From Swiss-Prot:
<dbReference type="GO" id="GO:0004111">
    <property type="term" value="F:creatine kinase activity"/>
</dbReference>
<feature type="short sequence motif" description="RDXXRA motif of the pArg binding pocket involved in allosteric regulation">
    <location>
        <begin position="330"/>
        <end position="335"/>
    </location>
</feature>
<comment type="similarity">
    <text>Belongs to the ATP:guanido phosphotransferase family.</text>
</comment>
<dbReference type="InterPro" id="IPR023660">
    <property type="entry name" value="Arg_Kinase"/>
</dbReference>
<dbReference type="InterPro" id="IPR022415">
    <property type="entry name" value="ATP-guanido_PTrfase_AS"/>
</dbReference>
<feature type="binding site">
    <location>
        <position position="118"/>
    </location>
    <ligand>
        <name>ATP</name>
    </ligand>
</feature>
<feature type="binding site">
    <location>
        <begin position="169"/>
        <end position="173"/>
    </location>
    <ligand>
        <name>ATP</name>
    </ligand>
</feature>
<feature type="binding site">
    <location>
        <begin position="25"/>
        <end position="29"/>
    </location>
    <ligand>
        <name>ATP</name>
    </ligand>
</feature>
<feature type="binding site">
    <location>
        <begin position="200"/>
        <end position="205"/>
    </location>
    <ligand>
        <name>ATP</name>
    </ligand>
</feature>
<dbReference type="GO" id="GO:0046314">
    <property type="term" value="P:phosphocreatine biosynthetic process"/>
</dbReference>
<dbReference type="GO" id="GO:0005524">
    <property type="term" value="F:ATP binding"/>
</dbReference>
<feature type="domain" description="Phosphagen kinase C-terminal">
    <location>
        <begin position="22"/>
        <end position="247"/>
    </location>
</feature>
<keyword id="KW-0547">Nucleotide-binding</keyword>
<keyword id="KW-0808">Transferase</keyword>
<dbReference type="InterPro" id="IPR000749">
    <property type="entry name" value="ATP-guanido_PTrfase"/>
</dbReference>
<protein>
    <recommendedName>
        <fullName>Protein-arginine kinase</fullName>
        <ecNumber>2.7.14.1</ecNumber>
    </recommendedName>
</protein>
<dbReference type="GO" id="GO:0005615">
    <property type="term" value="C:extracellular space"/>
</dbReference>
Length: 347
């Protein structure tokens, strides 16, 4: 377990990747349920425990994975795993949930989430096809040991009707400061929802978009083959990316002085503040990331932006110090950590 919490990013997430100035990460999730087994929402705690033990026994053969049962870890540890996107908020909140986690942190097989099984792959930058291929391979390995709930007409049966069919959910984490600062983000979000896509904050449903970070996902999984769903998703994602590029060009062309003032104010706060909330830290770091992308500030890399965001979250921060911290203590240590990072340079 400790290997997963020593560093804020796994080895793959530290690598530079395609379009990583705008796309922080790509995630593929496959929802699966076990045949002839009551679905998760109506399972008792004892039923969840039995299912967890059963799936652990069946999937123990997965090579290169570590099995983590949530009941064995405290709330802060689970929160830190969630902050790294290795488990979902639902798994973090349930002691009878578990995860098979790959050594390189690119694959999570979640047990007792909304569905019995959720296979997740996470890669840096814009790598939709690669993430799907990886998830497909893990799905095939799991299917060797499990019989899935499947209907010839409907496809994979899932707890939520929106997941029935392929059970496929593709997501990209997008950094969209240009659209946000130009005021264009709201109409784009409305249009995306009309097209059947969801857009949320960093941790999915119910979370905010601090740092202008948005999670774009497909909503429809029924009635189309995986290849068509992915093609449609990639087309929409690339349209959003293009809109963000245009918004950034407009900002540089017409509002450069205002931008420079904003960036240096954020740098000053990060460099000298004694207390920083996680929300303010992310917002200010988002400004620095955009400044680097636009050539106004140098010595920055997209993985460093992502790494700092994880490192400054409450759970990971407390794991770093090895103790529970009050809100003010977290804000103090967060500010200290940012100052030390800037002292060492941004790269």
């Amino acid at each position: 377990m400790e290997t997963f919490l020593t560093h804020p990013l796994g080895p793959k997430m530290k690598e530079r990747a395609k379009l990583d100035d705008l796309v922080v990460s790509t995630r593929i999730r496959l929802a699966r349920n076990v045949k002839d087994t009551v679905f998760s929402p109506v399972l008792s705690k004892e039923g969840e425990r039995q299912l967890c033990d059963r799936l652990e026994g069946r999937l123990r053969g997965l090579k290169g994975f570590e099995y983590l049962h949530m009941r064995d870890y405290d709330e802060v540890t689970r929160q830190a795993l969630m902050e790294k996107h290795l488990i979902s908020p639902a798994v973090a909140a349930n002691e009878e949930s578990a995860v098979f986690l790959s050594e390189d942190e690119t694959i999570s097989v979640l047990i007792n989430e909304e569905d019995h099984l959720r296979i997740q792959t996470l890669l840096p930058g814009y790598q939709v096809k690669e993430a799907f291929e990886l998830a497909n391979q893990v799905d095939a390995l799991c299917a060797e040991s499990l019989s899935y709930a499947f209907d010839e007409q409907l496809g994979y049966l899932t707890t939520c009707p929106s997941n029935i069919g392929t059970g496929l959910r593709a997501s990209v984490m997008l950094h969209l400061p240009g659209l946000t600062l130009t005021g264009r983000i709201s109409p784009i979000l409305r249009e995306l929802r009309k097209l059947g896509y969801t857009i949320r904050g960093r941790y999915g449903e119910g979370s905010d978009a601090a740092g202008r970070l948005f999670q774009l996902s497909n909503q429809r999984t029924l009635g189309s083959h995986e290849s068509q769903l992915l093609a449609d998703f990639m087309e929409v994602t690339e349209q959003v990316i293009q809109a963000e590029r245009h918004a950034r060009e407009e900002l540089i062309a017409h509002r450069q002085e205002e931008l420079e003032d904003r960036f240096y104010r954020s740098y000053g706060i990060l460099r000298y503040a004694k207390l920083l909330s996680s929300t303010e830290a992310i917002e200010r770091l988002s400004d620095l990331h955009l400044a680097s992308d636009l050539g106004i500030l140098s010595d920055w890399s997209p993985p460093k932006f992502h790494e700092l965001i994880v490192r400054l979250q409450s759970g990971f921060l407390q794991k770093h110090f090895g103790k529970t911290l009050s809100t003010q203590e977290r804000d103090r240590e967060r500010a200290t950590l940012v100052r030390r990072t800037l002292d060492q340079g941004l790269v």
